[in-house]
Structures are given as structure tokens and as C-alpha cells.
Amino acid sequence: MKESDSVEKRKVSMISLGCAKNLVDAEVMLGYLPQDRFEITTDEAQADIIIVNTCGFISDAKEESVETLLEAIEYKKSGNCTLLVVTGCLSQRYAEDMAKELPEVDILLGTGDVPRILELIEAHDRGEDVRQSVGLPQYLYDHTTPRVASSPFYSTYVKIAEGCNNLCSYCIIPQLRGPLRSRSIASVVAEVERLVAAGAQEVNLIAQDITAFGADRHDGASLEGLLRELVKISELRWLRLLYAYPDGISDELIELVATEEKICSYFDVPLQHIDDRVLARMNRRVGEDTIRDLIHRMRQRIPDLTLRTSFIVGFPGETDAEFAKLLAFVEEGHFDRVGVFRYSREEDTPAASLPDQVPEGVKKSRYNKLMKAQQRVSFRRNRALIGRVEPVLVEGYSEETELLLSGRSIRQAPDVDGQVYITAGQADVGQIVPLRITDSSEYDLIGEIVDESDE
């Protein structure tokens, strides 16, 4: 018998908060823990080690992270947990404060310390003081990095770059994640090939700004060049682009999305506002004319485009007139999906010191008005799809009822864009099938699987 066979494995529970980019970090971190010594569990009460991968982007995310940490501390007091590890953006930002305020936390890691997880657990086991182990955010994983999938086998995320050079005045991310660091095209292709071979039908490319991919490498790498290589992977079905900065969307990229069948006709382009004065204070590199021209070029070349964006309401100095302009812009109906954020005053950002901070009550009112306006737009755009046949990725039985299958159309990104409820027909989980849309709501679609032999 091997020595490792006689040692009881330690159970590890990973709680990952925030965005998909954070989820990839969590999967990589778990990959660094040898399977012959550690066993992953989703039951925190049974876990010997709990790792909380925090988000510290805005106030709501920080509050969720703190609440989750307090719950994990309770497991350490009353459950099996003997080691509590905190990593991610919140610990990168507030390691010193957290070390003082949360003595129950054994190890604090930053966003750049992912590959040190095993080293630090072993150091803690030896009695070394490794509570504050937050380093500079310089890490970047590649195709050789071990990774434990937590997403369904048929859909996955691939982080093509880390960090950001955009320096928007409201955003703390460059301080938490560091400057732009792009992977090589060969590395991304190798990872996607492996994931597709393991059954992935949908690959979602992510970064803080995917359009900046390659700008730091000085080897000619670009998002367009990467996509040309990825579409050569024969078994890949859907390739989705998430988080594209508007001034990085070239005509060449639009043409690729328009003509390459494997690239979803879907763009997620955070615009943040439409008023030039607000955009300038946000330190965005685009104005209203550029935004409108971009939307026109995208819609003209990709008639079937699904366009998602996000806006910030209540930015410092945003007047009633500036908000009214944003509201009218949304009501024009350009977008299939919109995420709205109330401005969060983040310390150590230029916007935090701007005059004319907007009261929380006004932010909330503007948020509600903008969301309601987009709900009406989304409802109309979804109703226009009734009668069409669309490809749908089947994800399993609905959370609402086991009588219905559910999935996502090619128009719906994971986690943020609603679902398709399948009222007739059968398919396997992970299968992409044609579906005729029979009904819709603001966010979801309803339809029946089409027998292709009858078409």
C-alpha cells in the first residue's frame, strides 16, 4: 500500500463569489491541491478546509463577501473546519484590516497568490505564521495549469488575459488585478482544445477587457488572431465573447463575428453612460458619437446580433438632465440585455473625491427607472423572436419544475441572460438542439424542440 493511500484526505470546500473571472481563479486554485491528499466537497459543515474566494469590486460585493466570511467562521467554530483561507479581491484590497478584524482567518491570499495555495497550507501545518501572504497581482495561468472544473461539462470559461490598463475613474480593478497580462494564442488554443475534447460545447472567453488581448505582448497577438485559430477547432460549437471595451471593437472583429458560424452573434459591451460629460468624468475613451456609430456598425453588419451592455447611474455630478438622456437612450431600444449598477464610491479611485456625490435615494430611483425601461425593451425584443427556430443548449431539468427541460439559446450567456423553458421534445444534457420559440417574457423564452427530420 502506498503511503498516500493510508492518509485520510482532507476535505476542502471552495466558496467563490463574484464574476466568472473569479470562478476561474477558484478552479485553478483547487487544481493546485493534489487529489491524493485533498477531496473537494460542497458541504461546508463537513469541510476540514474552507476557502472563500472573495469579490471586492463594489459595495454590494464587499458586503456579500463579508457575510459569507462570517458564515464560514461559524463553520470553523461549530463544524469540522480547522483551516480558513480567504483569497480574492477583498483580501487583496484589505488584507491588513482583515487580519486585525478577523482573527479566525488562518491565511489571507491576494489575487496573484493562486499558485501558492498548497505551499501556504503546508506552511500553516508546520506552525508558520502565514496569515498575511498577499503579494503583487502578477499571476497569469496557462494551459499547463491544473484546473478543477466547477461549471457543467458542456459550458466553460477561459480567461485569456488578466488585469486592466483602462483606468476608468470609478474602478478599483487595476489596483486589485494589476496591469494587462495576456496569454499567448498557443496557450489559449491548447486549453480550449482540451476543454472541447472533454465535452465543452460552449466556450466563453473572458478578461477584464477582451479587446485589449495581446496589446502587452509585442508579438502581434490580437483577439482577432486568437479567434481565427479557435474557430479551427472542429468540435467547438459556440464561442462567446464577454466584456469588450467599446473602442477596442474593430471592423475586423465585427466581420469575424458576422461571418464565423462558431462565434456567437453576441457582444457584451459595457458602455456605462451615453452623456459625453459623464463619460469624460468616468475617464472613458468614448463619447456619444462613437457609441452610436459602433452600435450602427454592429447592427448593420450583424443583423441578428444580441447586444448586452451595462450602465452606471448616480455617478458623481450626474444631473437630472444627464440621467434623462441615458434613460431616453435606453428607451430607443438598442439593447437586448442591460445590467444597471448604482455608483459605488470606492476609496482610492479618482471618482471618490469628485464633488457632487449623488444621494443614495436618487441612485435607487434612477436604477429602478432604467431597469423598468429596459424590461419593456427586452420584452419587445423577446416577443419578436416568437415563431423563430433558434439553437438551444440543453442544461437539464428546470429549477421550477422537473416536468420541463431548460437551457439557453445562443442569445443567452450563462448566469446573466435568462433561460429557455422547453415544453415539448427530449434531448440530452449538453446537447445543442433546434427549438421553435412559442412564448416569451422579459428575460426568458419558451419553446419546443424541432424534429429536424420534419423541417
Curated annotation (Swiss-Prot):
Gene3D superfamilies: Methylthiotransferase, N-terminal domain, Nucleic acid-binding proteins, tm_1862 like domain
Domain Radical SAM core residues, every copy: 150-380
Main enzyme class: transferase
UniProt subcellular location: Cytoplasm
Cofactor note: Binds 2 [4Fe-4S] clusters. One cluster is coordinated with 3 cysteines and an exchangeable S-adenosyl-L-methionine.
Chief localisation class: cytoplasm
Record-listed E.C. numbers: 2.8.4.4
GO cellular component: cytosol
Cofactor(s) the record lists: [4Fe-4S] cluster
UniProt binding sites for [4Fe-4S] cluster 2: C164, C168, C171
InterPro entries for this protein: Elp3/MiaA/NifB-like_rSAM (IPR006638), Methylthiotransferase (IPR005839), Methylthiotransferase_CS (IPR020612), Methylthiotransferase_N (IPR013848), Methylthiotransferase_N_sf (IPR038135), NA-bd_OB-fold (IPR012340), Ribosomal_uS12_MeSTrfase_RimO (IPR005840), rSAM (IPR007197)
Short name of one Pfam family: Radical_SAM
GO biological process, alphabetically ordered: tRNA modification
Swiss-Prot/TrEMBL keywords: 4Fe-4S, Cytoplasm, Iron, Iron-sulfur, Metal-binding, S-adenosyl-L-methionine, Transferase
Annotated [4Fe-4S] cluster 1 binding sites: C19, C55, C89
Any one GO MF annotation of this record: aspartic acid methylthiotransferase activity
Domain (TRAM): residue spans on this chain: 383-451
Top-rank lineage group of the source organism: Bacteria
Family the entry assigns: Belongs to the methylthiotransferase family. RimO subfamily.
Xref: HAMAP family: MTTase_RimO
Function text: Catalyzes the methylthiolation of an aspartic acid residue of ribosomal protein uS12.
The name this protein goes by in its record: Ribosomal protein uS12 methylthiotransferase RimO
Originating organism: Syntrophotalea carbinolica (strain DSM 2380 / NBRC 103641 / GraBd1)
Gene this chain is encoded by: rimO
